[in-house]
């Protein structure tokens, strides 16, 4: 009888541990693909784009995502950080491009740094975020950037009510306001539809192409993409996403995106 009791306790402990691990993996999968998750993220994202005329571009972006219990600015505290908080996102891209059969210049160096500041509001069905963005002309050599200071607005709507499914949209609109007078002014919008579906334990299928509408030149860039994210632990995920431009001046460009995403509990501030 004692042996059966011990066996029962061991089985129950094992099942509880398995259930806890499964819940942690599910939570990590949700956090990895949710742009408004209250989780600190350190991401490394190498992208390789193949263009016409044997041209190519490698873009390695380092991204830091830091949530805080504030309202837009670090010194304005949220009354209820569990429902209203701020996400700061800093992107630092390093680009290497080659154009062997074109008039554009080969170059390698840092591109423009991007900073987003989004206030997130939790809803019964998901999340809403609204904020600002700043593009800094940090490119060196200058050919790798816009040469302009640009700022604008950003917003996110994300439905997370259904377990294992996220859908919504993220947009950013920028206007240039200063910078190199010899460079063209900037007025463009980025729209990113978001559709993430858990298809297996720790595996997420993601549709999230970034469309670019260049109002200044009356152009647009429409890609299609389908990526897969694998969560290896409660604090680590990797994703692979092929992307193809189906319409616009860069039609036919093919990009492979790879991302390593490390997640940490946010600082308590």
Task: Report residues per predicted region.
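Transmembrane beta-barrel domains of Gram-negative outer membranes and organellar outer membranes
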Residues: 19-269
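Bacterial Sec-dependent N-terminal signal peptides
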Residues: 1-19
């Amino acid at each position: 009888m004692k042996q059966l009791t011990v066996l029962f306790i061991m089985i129950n402990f094992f099942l509880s541990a398995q259930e806890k691990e499964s819940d942690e993996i599910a939570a990590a999968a949700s956090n990895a693909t949710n742009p408004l998750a209250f989780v600190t993220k350190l991401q490394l994202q190498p992208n390789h784009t193949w263009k016409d005329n044997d041209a190519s571009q490698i873009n390695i972006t380092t991204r830091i995502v830091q949530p805080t219990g504030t309202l837009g600015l670090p010194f304005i505290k949220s009354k209820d950080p569990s429902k209203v908080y701020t996400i700061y996102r800093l992107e630092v891209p390093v680009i290497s491009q080659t154009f062997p059969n074109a008039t554009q210049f080969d170059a390698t160096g840092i591109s423009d740094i991007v900073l987003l500041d989004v206030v997130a509001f939790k809803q019964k069905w998901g999340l809403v975020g609204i904020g600002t963005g700043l593009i800094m002309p940090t490119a060196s050599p200058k050919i790798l950037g816009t040469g302009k200071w640009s700022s604008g607005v950003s917003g996110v709507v994300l439905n997370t009510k259904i377990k294992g499914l996220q859908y919504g949209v993220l947009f950013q609109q920028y206007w240039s306001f200063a910078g190199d007078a010899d460079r063209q002014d900037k007025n463009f919008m980025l729209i990113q539809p978001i559709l993430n579906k858990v298809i297996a334990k720790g595996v997420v299928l993601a549709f999230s192409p970034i469309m670019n509408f260049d109002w200044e030149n009356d152009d647009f860039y429409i890609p299609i993409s389908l990526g897969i994210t694998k969560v290896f632990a409660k604090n680590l995920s990797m994703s692979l996403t092929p992307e193809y431009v189906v319409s616009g001046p860069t039609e036919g460009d093919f990009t492979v995106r790879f991302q390593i995403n490390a997640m940490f509990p946010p600082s308590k501030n």
